[in-house]
A protein has these predicted regions:
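Generic short amphipathic/hydrophobic targeting helices enriched at N-termini
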Residues: 15, 26-27, 38, 146
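Active-site neighborhoods and metal-handling regions in enzymes and metal-associated proteins
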Residues: 6-9, 38-513
Length: 513
């Protein structure tokens, strides 16, 4: 699942903590398919070690991690806040973690909803205050008392360090922000400090148990993709493929989609986050399938682009080869101790050279005039077709922190995607401002844009850097052209088009084409 251009791999901010080095720092590790499972729960001792590391990174005072509230809309599936989850592993709504430190003294409190037999009839059993210590090794408190306890602690300590869903929204403030507003109002002299970066630095290096869950998430995700391809044929609805994949994930123990599933055919393949998934795939088109599952709270992220009729056209094949070559070029840079930036640089060079050869850009370094008339600037022509980052970390959320954003280097414990893409929108020339210089650019690339219009290709895999090597956890889903075409040459699974026709009549007033 692509991220915006601003998240493209880049030089990190300076950090004063030492970077771990290995004797084999510059040795290229073999990228392999997944190995045997670890098969164990994350121990309470690992969560305790995470809290120890966080306390060591923060000054004395009060730290607060806020869990997510109970969903308010029709009992939708609850997802815990990743910061709170990382530090506790506790998956009930309405909980909070408070850590108080002063010198060598330290106390940890987990605030949870109290037992309520009448309420539990509706939403399931609660651990309750009494169950916290024997289960999690923390001191339990009732969530109803959180505000009062914080007020008493903040009367002594001048700062509150917070991690949670804070400061993210441009408009509506989150419930976490609203809670902190009340804390500030009650304690006007207290400084509220964003502690998310401190937790992110810990989350960026995955433990063995976390890597095991990410491996399983990748394996199950790939099997869902394979199941979807068994149905692929001209005339199928995008949502049928989505349903086939998501069924396999749940059947195999996945938690459900790790982000909004993207299945985009034809022109929809050129929309990065298209997730309506309601179009009918047509003969001669490509279809981008960017969908994945969580497993035990850890997110995979996998994208494949395949021909609806089972065979790539010459134009589709040409664009696909460039994107695959870019991914392989980046993949060759994945080595312990290697610079993370080299992955993006290698992929970008391949994409730019390939687009030049197809006539879609004038040269690898060519630019066009972008911005506004008042603030004109030059942008790479490459960015007309490749406007997102090469990849991102994966973990408790699909766009998770990874240590390379801090250290600039790949190390054991990294977990990330590599996902180059090219998107030739039919109206691409309309995106280019109509300046005298740009008119000449449009004239030179216009024929190529028309030739490759509506071709969108993205190829994405997940990479886990372990003590014994680098695992491409999504490798079971083919990416080579010959392997994809061979897979699609197999007999198609039967489907009932009447069901889809019914949907079409209700949504559009006409049957499926």
């Amino acid at each position: 699942m692509p991220r915006a251009l601003l998240t493209r791999l880049r030089r990190p901010r300076l950090d004063h903590r030492p970077v771990r080095t290995l004797a084999a720092a510059l040795t290229l590790l073999v990228i392999t398919a997944p190995t045997a499972p670890l098969g164990a729960q994350i121990a309470a001792s690992e969560f305790a070690a995470r809290r120890d590391a966080l306390v060591a990174a923060l000054p004395d005072g009060v730290f607060l991690a806020l869990g997510n509230p109970e969903p308010v809309l029709d009992y939708v599936t609850f997802h815990q806040d990743p910061y709170f989850n990382y530090l506790t592993g506790f998956d009930e709504p309405g909980a909070s973690l408070v850590i108080v430190t002063r010198g060598s003294e330290r106390r940890e409190f987990l605030f949870v909803q109290g037992k309520d037999p009448a309420r539990e009839v509706w939403t399931g059993n609660r651990l309750g205050v009494a169950g916290v210590r024997p289960t999690l090794g923390l001191e339990g408190r009732d969530a109803a008392n959180l505000a009062a306890v914080l007020d008493s602690l903040l009367a002594i300590h001048p700062a509150l360090h917070v991690a949670g869903d804070i400061g993210r929204r441009m408009t509506e403030r989150s419930l976490h922000d609203q809670f902190l507003d009340a804390v500030r109002a009650a304690n006007p002299r207290v400084e509220v400090v964003d502690a998310r970066r401190a937790v992110d630095q810990l989350r960026g290096r995955k433990s063995t148990a976390e890597l095991d869950r990410l491996r399983l998430a990748g394996e199950i995700t790939a099997r869902g993709h394979l199941a979807a391809l068994e149905l692929l044929t001209p005339g199928i609805a995008e949502f049928e493929l989505q349903a086939a994949a998501e069924y396999v994930w749940r059947r195999e123990g996945g938690d459900g989609p790790s982000y909004g599933s993207i299945v985009g055919s034809g022109p929809n393949a050129t929309t990065l986050h298209y997730n309506r998934d309601d179009r009918t795939a047509q003969d001669g088109e490509l279809i981008v399938m960017d969908l994945a599952t969580y497993f035990d709270g850890y997110a995979a992220d996998l994208t494949r682009t395949v021909p609806v009729n089972g065979r790539f056209s010459p134009a589709q094949r040409a664009v696909y080869k460039i994107v695959l070559a870019a991914q392989l070029a980046a993949e060759r840079q994945v080595r312990v101790g290697g610079p993370a930036r080299a992955m993006s640089d290698s992929a970008t060079a391949v994409l730019a050279a390939g687009l030049t050869e197809l006539g879609l850009i004038e040269s690898p370094d060519a630019t066009y005039e972008c911005g506004t008339t008042a603030q004109a600037r030059n942008c790479p022509q490459l960015s007309l077709y490749y406007m997102h980052g090469l990849g991102h970390g994966i973990g408790l959320v699909v766009h998770d922190p990874d240590q390379y954003t801090r250290t600039g280097r790949i190390d054991v414990g990294s977990a990330f995607t590599i996902e180059p893409g090219l998107y030739v929108r039919r109206n691409l020339l309309d995106i280019i401002p109509d300046t005298p210089r740009n008119k000449a650019v449009k004239a030179r690339i216009g024929a190529a844009v028309a030739r490759y219009a509506d071709i969108g290709v993205r190829i994405e895999d997940d990479y886990l850097v372990t003590e014994t090597g680098i695992i491409r956890s999504t490798a079971a889903m083919p990416r080579e052209i010959a392997a994809i075409e061979q897979l699609l040459a197999a007999p198609r699974r039967p489907r009932d088009p009447a069901v889809v026709d019914r949907y079409r009549r209700y949504r559009t007033g006409r049957p499926t084409p």
